[in-house]
């Protein structure tokens, strides 16, 4: 059968990177920071994966899209 009973204990609660480090503004020119929140294929990682709060996820998405538009980040990464 598909699935089955789940095993394991409690999952560790993800903490927002920006709240924990006191970052209030996400700059689109800071590509090293933005790359942490992009998958290896170039997609923006969701909140459930990164643990980012809703406020900072919106700011992060805007910054990544700006950086892509300014050609600082790629829209997609090539498959090897």
Curated annotation (Swiss-Prot):
Instruction: Fetch the SUPFAM superfamilies from UniProt.
Output: Ribosomal protein S18
Ranges in a coiled coil? none
What's in the keyword line of the UniProt record?
A: Ribonucleoprotein, Ribosomal protein, RNA-binding, rRNA-binding
One GO term under biological process is: translation
GO MF? small ribosomal subunit rRNA binding; structural constituent of ribosome
Question: Which InterPro entries does this chain map to?
Answer: Ribosomal_bS18, Ribosomal_bS18_CS, Ribosomal_bS18_sf
Which Gene3D superfamilies does this chain map to? Answer: Ribosomal protein S18
Q: Which Pfam family would be a valid example here? A: Ribosomal_S18
Task: Offer a single GO CC term for the protein.
Answer: cytosolic small ribosomal subunit
Family label: Belongs to the bacterial ribosomal protein bS18 family.
Summary of the function given for this chain in its UniProt record: Binds as a heterodimer with protein bS6 to the central domain of the 16S rRNA, where it helps stabilize the platform of the 30S subunit.
Q: How does it assemble?
A: Part of the 30S ribosomal subunit. Forms a tight heterodimer with protein bS6.
Specify the protein name.
Answer: Small ribosomal subunit protein bS18
Organism of provenance: Staphylococcus carnosus (strain TM300)
- Supply the gene name: rpsR
């Amino acid at each position: 059968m598909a699935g089955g009973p789940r095993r394991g204990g409690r999952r560790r609660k993800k903490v927002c990177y920006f709240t924990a480090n006191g970052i209030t503004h996400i700059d689109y020119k800071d590509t090293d920071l933005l790359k942490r929140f992009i998958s290896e294929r170039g997609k923006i990682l969701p909140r459930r994966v990164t643990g980012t709060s809703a406020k900072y996820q919106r700011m992060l998405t805007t910054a990544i899209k700006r950086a892509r538009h300014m050609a600082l980040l790629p829209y997609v990464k090539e498959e090897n």
